[in-house]
Regions:
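Thiamine diphosphate
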Residues: 1-174
């Protein structure tokens, strides 16, 4: 199975849980996350503007309401816009609230393609994975072709237990 095929299978696996909601730009309108959400019910898709801080903030709120959010960040370059929500809200709410609140989300983050067409330039292909590991205290997983579905399965288990996970995809692998 191709890398993209595995991503699609992983999204279908997540969607089998009725509490899962996919959040992001292009998840419902304009491509359904590059086709990887084609078989997911519209009722599980929440389309947002290109506003990464909003996406993660929305995910935090949905998690507190008992849902299981999966945020699609189409280019890692723009995760920087979401760091306030990731570090100071999603990542710190449990400590700030003395364990009263424990929001969690899956962050699906894509590094843009550098070696395959369409090269989208230096502002759409940066990899901040190592830097993010220095400031985010939940697991960050770089997806390999042979483990895409299993890594998303583990992320869903962690999510159900109240732990966030960031999964990093490489568009060049598609």
């Amino acid at each position: 199975m191709t890398y993209k095929g595995q991503l699609t299978a992983a999204m279908n696996l997540l969607a089998a849980d009725p509490a899962v909601r996919f959040i992001g730009y292009g998840v419902k309108i304009g491509g359904r996350a590059a086709g990887t959400l084609n078989h997911v019910s519209d009722s599980q898709l929440i389309e947002t503007p290109v506003a990464e801080n909003l996406m993660v903030g929305l995910a935090t709120g949905l998690s507190l309401a008992g849902l299981k959010p999966v945020v699609f960040i189409e280019r890692m370059d723009f995760i920087l816009n979401a760091l306030d929500a990731i570090v100071n809200h999603l990542g710190a709410a449990q400590a700030i609230s003395c364990n009263q609140f424990k929001p969690a989300a899956i962050l699906r983050v894509v590094i843009g393609n550098k070696s395959k067409p369409l090269y989208t330039g230096p502002t759409h292909t940066q990899d901040f994975t190592q830097a993010l590991r220095q400031i985010i205290d939940f697991p960050i997983v770089e997806l390999k072709k042979e483990s895409v579905v299993s890594e998303y399965r583990y992320a869903l288990i962690r999510l159900s237990a109240g732990t966030s996970t960031m999964l990093v995809e490489r568009k060049d692998e598609w």
